[in-house]
Regions:
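Membrane transport/envelope proteins' first extracytoplasmic loop
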Residues: 2-266
Length: 266
């Protein structure tokens, strides 16, 4: 009789232990379920970003603005670049994600041009791209000091049959007719890595731009005092920092940017 009671107590102890373990596992399942759900959501977000990059051939997390400023209001290139950087700063005050890269391009309308080796009546835009030397490979040529140096893309070179060292004679308005300015092609350039996030807009996308230094660009602005400066600004963000906890918040901020600024895009 005594042994029977002892066995019942032992069995009850193991039964209680099993029940306790079951309850603990049950509680753990409910506690961990949101974690599993969150992890799955983050994986889905990451896959969506990756698929977008592959299918659309563009960096998946970017904020951008394109438009024009009057030369009369912005007398030099740095004032325009500072304005664009101000937009980037404002965006990231709300969308608190690390910057991966930023591409800023400013251009003047340029004009018709002839080229040294027989090209007639081509149209070129004058541009300044601050990141060109860092993100593009170049083929250099010898130049003289009597002309302004410029760089062109391989696409522009092929399109017009230009070569390094060739001169471009650009006709620009000076208020009393036409004035000719000579540029010499000092560099042919192409993207070092076209898949780098910096190349939100590739050299081919930029059209027939003759790229000049910042100093030369500022000098050209004197001939376009009644014109506008066109600009594009692309800010690339680290999409890996976007997750299920902040995606809705950041999306809301971006929608507010669109409502407040018709030139903004993402």
């Amino acid at each position: 009789m005594f042994g029977f009671v002892i066995n019942k107590l032992k069995n009850r102890k193991w039964l209680n232990l099993c029940l306790l373990m079951g309850v603990a596992l049950f509680i753990a399942l409910f506690v961990c379920h949101p974690m599993f759900e969150k992890g799955a959501g983050n994986q889905i977000l990451d896959r969506l970003f990756t698929d977008h990059a592959t299918q659309q051939n563009e960096y998946p997390a970017q904020m951008s603005r394109e438009g024009t400023y009057a030369v009369a209001d912005y007398p030099d290139s740095q004032s325009v670049l500072d304005k664009l950087s101000g937009y980037e700063k404002k965006w990231t005050e709300y969308v608190d994600i690390n910057k991966v890269s930023s591409q800023q391009l400013i251009t003047l309308s340029g004009g018709r041009a002839d080229t040294e080796f027989g090209g007639l009546n081509h149209y070129f835009t004058i541009g300044y791209l601050p990141g060109l030397s860092e993100y593009a490979d170049v083929v250099k040529s010898q130049t003289d000091t009597a002309t302004f140096e410029c760089s062109i893309s391989e696409k522009t070179m092929d399109h017009y049959g230009l070569v390094a060292g060739e001169k471009i004679y650009l006709h620009v308005p000076d208020g009393s007719g036409k004035k000719e300015i000579s540029f010499v092609i000092s560099q042919i350039c192409r993207e070092k890595d076209i898949n780098d996030p910096y190349w939100a807009k590739t050299l081919s996308d930029m059209g027939d731009v003759i790229f000049v230094s910042q100093d030369v660009f500022d000098e050209m602005m004197q001939y376009y005092s009644e014109d506008n400066i066109s600009y594009s600004d692309f800010l690339m963000l680290d999409y890996r920092q976007i997750n299920t906890e902040n995606a809705s918040l950041y999306d809301g901020y971006m929608e507010q940017f669109k409502d407040a600024d018709k030139l903004y895009n993402d």
